[in-house]
């Protein structure tokens, strides 16, 4: 037993193997439905959908479950909540609907998969988590827009001005992080307003993630008042190309601050930023007289606040010499009017020097300025002496000592000589006192001009050039000479050190050296010029050992940090400014370092870290270390915020060490992008990107770029080593594994560069031998176990023109019909082996009068028709110009065989004679034979057939043999009693077209008596005469083809044609023993065939339609079951041509925009002229020819309530263009409704079809017009988009729209004027209600709701190419003030002659009165001249203004060391000459009276209207006023019709007076007290400066300067440079007044309200809040940066700010 139960070793091994198999089976079954990763759930990743895409795969792509889903397991998805989102495809999940992670806040999807093991039926449910990855598909969206802020101009640089910018991005991770920056605006965005600009560069966003806007540059309200900042919000997608952004606009309004002193203003002052430098006034009083209000020169005392705050000004005397000046003079503290309170005598004082103070009345700092006032006490004057100089211009160095001589251009001293005409040669010469209008120079006793003041400064604000006048005065008599003008130029010397402005203490927050921050900017000024004024900056010293922590820009003076600054540190920076001469100055900048708020987040050392890690890296191994530093030195905490969804990495919160915490698998994921956040204790954070690349072994093949495959290259033949092309492959591996070498087979004529992949030719190629090569290029990487990649290459060899054309055929035989002109005979074709063939065909041999050859195509055509009967064959030899050889292939022989055509009709041989027959002759008896022949050369055109065509009963009793022409008796003649028959025999051929001739045969019948014994037996005698000798050829069609024309109106079941069958027999009572059938062409079953004796009938079964098909080609076949059918003629073709008929009516084409259903809509306007096109209707007719030609006619509607509306219009009969026939100004009964009729058949009445449509015409008024604005597109850009624009309007309104026109965009300026922008477009349109058929008012509720409400208007922002609709408004238009006078004169033949006589009498009377008036005026004028010659008086001198023209070189310069200049004015007539210098001419020809006639302007003389006259009424013109110009701009532009008035009386003869009447300016005093023009004394030389439009303000017509005849009124804006700005209105030739937006603030200074004229002189009724103080010359004045139009000084229009010129006039 023991032995029996023991196991042998062999049995033990077998049992052990069986046990292993059983365990394997059990374990294999138990693994089914298990998760391959060993987890209890499955985690997958999938990207969210882009729009509606659902094809994205999961990661991993299949469910990691053991088992084959087709054979081993069954899988089902279970969604406990909601609808299914995925479906299973094997183990792959496929989306059923798009995923939107952002809108649905969908971060993951949880569901289950049910897995059933098929073998056991065991079921298991596995949870599945699908994580939805975000993609960057949402752009940031700004919140709470629009953005706008107002900041004062004094805001320091670095101040945060706006913190409310916020944009949200719906994406997650870095895709949802938003950063902000300021972008440069478009050029057109800042050109709308004068004082607006793009804020790019002026403002900045220091921290992009916060979006806080700070000031980057100093603000200046006087320059820019509004900034537009383009704010861009961008997300931070990993790939910068995928980043999305949006933009908005921040409007920054600059508020003015009280930072400018007041300034005196008057004509000719030197200005610096709108402020007069060294203002000086002068006045004179006669000794012993009390004048009251004094006349001040150059103008009344006036000061203004340079800030827009416009504070009131208080005037006072600050000081004066002599000290008793206050006893004699006082100044009004409000108006600045200077008064004399007590008479003064020359013994008391001859001159008073007073300092006038102008102080702002404001709550803040009391800013003030001063001016010098000189009051002269005038003695009695005598005859003046005459002074002359050696030169008019001199030169001297600045800072020259007193007594330095002034030299001329040649180095000679300038000397003076004085003579007196009153002194004889024997009289002793007095010692004259030379008086100069400048204290800077003097004349020595010997008459030499020398320097009279120390430290004459050429540098600003000094003028640099002195233009003054010299007067020689007698000490005893005080008689003065006429003024002599001189100019002295100061030459620059480097005598000014740069001056550094004081810098307030600076506070700066602590920071590290990673950023260079601006501390401040120092500015130095050097009053020298040229190289002497070039300043360089340097840091001289820094306290606290901080010399290495600050730098300064040597050119700009910007001080910036460059080292780490700690809170609590203080530094004193000594800055030195040095010019080229070594002169320097220093200033100290105090800098304090403050800790500041926690405003800066930690910053990573690098924004992006690139790291590599092997996929075999151990867990907890270090990947890299990131480090961020906080500017405030706060502790930093690190975290991973994105990219670590698989939890394979971790970062140390304090150390920043990134480690691996799970095994990496490069085959699953090759790269990771982690977003790390560094956050300080204050909650501020920043992020950095860590790109981790998982390295791998060489497991990738080189791959050629798929977009370039297959490679196809081209190379010219005959070139060795020519470049063919470059192939390129890439290897996903790295290092040596990615180094690729290229190779190609060695048996081809090409080589390849193993490194670059460039393929070259190894030898010269021949296109003719082989024009294409195909081979394979191999790319191999550099790894030891190299991998390969291949690509196919095709090289096309390009041919060069080295071959001549050859013909492949030697001969071509063609057949063409005769009589065909321009018939295509054949097309010959030569072959040029070159790839760019050049072939020109030519006829070498042949009849050139009958044939021609196309040079390019090789087409051979007939020139005229050929004649078969004349010549049956033609031979042509054709060659090419490129090949002049005669060998084989050089030419081709074209043999043309002419085919005969049926062009000759049959002709009877003889004229048949009458035939007499007895009535007893039997049926079939031949009574005559009429043979005919056909001249055509071929069959069937020369085959003749015969038939009887009439007349009467003849066809009943006679018949003709169709082949022979034999006429037989057909029926018993006894049946009729007729004795004569006319038999017409028609001989026709079988050609196409069929031709025929007819011959008449008269048959006389002789009737015989009938006999019963001689009864005629009518047995079928024809049987004996019809032997079938022709059956040998069988049945056949008579012709190969037939053609017939059929009208399209032919009825169904009609016979179209009988097709004859040759050799057919009469079938008797039965059907014929043959039949015809269709082979092709009858696909629609339109035709049918029926058999008949000797032929087949072609029948029409269905109706024809020419418009659908105009011809049919049928193929027929002949068959017979009894008789033989000739196989050569058993088929034929039938061509059926359908003839068109008028069976279609016209149909109107209703334009969607102006028509609806059966109605056309259009409009007219009141201004529309006669014969204006308003509409074009179109109708189409499907018929052809004249049947499709449409004509148009207008008809009145019977139900129309307006009589004859068509009388207002006319329509072109041919084109359908509707034009106006009348004017519509007085017509109000609209809409007009009438009919238009379209008639075909070219308008013929008979047989035509008609269609009518309605036309509705409305009258368009302004209330119906609307404008759709496109601010970014010109009208030329939108010309081609009418349809899109009108579709937009129809869609939005549901009405019928029409576009009236396109024009440049117009908008209202602040002053009410219309401004035109040619770069934008206004689309003028109107709307018609299709229900009422009337125009819709723009105030209609439907317009309000569909277009004008904000919600509806936002929907109009649809975009065309390069254009976007903005809004809808009423259109603006410049109203042309052109009065069109149209007089409708009805001439009465009886009254008209008397009317002409009456008009003639009135003209005669008025002419006589005018002549009398002229004579009286001339007499008075002569008397006046006579009195003037006899009158003489002495007068004291007058003082003239100092015209100091200077423009500030920089905004930082201040008015200091103001010079005082003594001035005098000689009140003499001033002509409007153009000389630039003051010239005096005392020649005899210019003086009809003595110098004593010069009368000075006094208060008394002009107030009372008596006294002496001003010399402005005299012809003695002794001075020339020059208009100072800098840029030659037309500052005092004349826009009137009369542009060339040469008025020598352009200086007023009126005195400066204070009139109690309401005069705008004391220079003008008309008798009625109405407001007159401002009169500028001796300055303005143009008629536009001193007038209003005639009749508007009661101008004194006698005033020589009022220019009462000027037809137009100009409102001009004259800026500091004299330019006419873009907003200035001009006066056009039609007299149109165009208002302008003027002044620095763009305010409306020229507003006129009704007929009232506001007070322009601030001396009377001035209110600081009233902005309607107008310039009485209607000219706004831009003085520097300020608008002085409200003050009433017209001369400021002609000011030019010369930088170096001072003009003093006497």
From Swiss-Prot:
Gene disruption: observed consequences: Females display reduced fertility as well as defective eggshell development. Ovarian follicle cell microvilli are abnormally shaped and display a range of defects including decreased length, reduced number and an irregular distribution pattern, leading to impaired vitelline membrane formation. In the intestines of 3-day old adults there is no formation of endosomes and consequently no DUOX-dependent up-regulation of reactive oxygen species (ROS) in response to the ingestion of bacteria-derived uracil.
Gene3D superfamilies referenced in this protein's UniProt entry, alphabetically: Cadherins (2.60.40.60)
Cytoplasmic side: 1417-1706
Keyword hit for Manganese: no
Span of domain Cadherin: 68-142, 143-264, 277-387, 388-500, 519-604, 605-704, 707-807, 808-908, 909-1005, 1038-1148, 1156-1270
Signal peptide limits: 1-28
Keyword GTP-binding in record: no
PROSITE patterns xrefs: CADHERIN_1, CADHERIN_2
Subunit composition and interactions: Interacts (via the cytoplasmic domain) with ck. Interacts (via the cytoplasmic domain) with Cul1 and Ubr3.
Protein role: Cadherin that functions in epithelial morphogenesis and the intestine epithelial immune response. Essential for female fertility. Regulates the length and organization of apical microvilli in developing follicle cells and salivary glands. Function in the follicle cell is essential for egg development as the microvilli secrete eggshell material such as the vitelline membrane. Acts at least in part by regulating the recruitment of the myosin ck to the follicle cell microvilli.
Protein name: Cadherin-99C
Gene: Cad99C
